Amino acid sequence: SAPQSIWYGPDRPKNRELEVIHSRFGEAVWFK
């Protein structure tokens, strides 16, 4: 799994669908 700082830091994606995906899977599962 990717470092959480990537997803929770300043560069965290603001796309709500991606946030839902993250909360459901508990992992950074999207592609950049």
Swiss-Prot record:
Q: Which residues bind chlorophyll a 2?
A: H22
Compartments annotated for it: namely:
Plastid, Chloroplast thylakoid membrane
Keywords, A to Z? Chlorophyll, Chloroplast, Chromophore, Magnesium, Membrane, Metal-binding, Phosphoprotein, Photosynthesis, Photosystem I, Photosystem II, Plastid, Thylakoid, Transmembrane
Entry GO CC: chloroplast thylakoid membrane; photosystem I; photosystem II
Q: Has keyword Chloroplast? A: yes
Tree of life domain: Eukaryota
Q: How is the cofactor bound?
A: Binds at least 14 chlorophylls (8 Chl-a and 6 Chl-b) and carotenoids such as lutein and neoxanthin.
Q: Summarize what the UniProt record says about post-translational modification.
A: Photoregulated by reversible phosphorylation of its threonine residues.
- What residues does chlorophyll a 1 bind to? E19
Q: Name one GO biological process term.
A: photosynthesis
| Sequence positions that bind chlorophyll b | R24
Topology versus the membrane, per the UniProt entry? Multi-pass membrane protein
What are this entry's molecular-function GO terms?
A: chlorophyll binding; metal ion binding
Q: What's this chain's function? A: The light-harvesting complex (LHC) functions as a light receptor, it captures and delivers excitation energy to photosystems with which it is closely associated.
> Could you give the domain comment from the record?
The N-terminus of the protein extends into the stroma where it is involved with adhesion of granal membranes and post-translational modifications; both are believed to mediate the distribution of excitation energy between photosystems I and II.
What family name appears in the similarity comment?
Belongs to the light-harvesting chlorophyll a/b-binding (LHC) protein family.
Known partners and oligomeric status: The LHC complex consists of chlorophyll a-b binding proteins.
- The name this protein carries in UniProt is Chlorophyll a-b binding protein 2, chloroplastic
Species = Populus euphratica
Q: What is the lineage of its organism?
A: Eukaryota, Viridiplantae, Streptophyta, Embryophyta, Tracheophyta
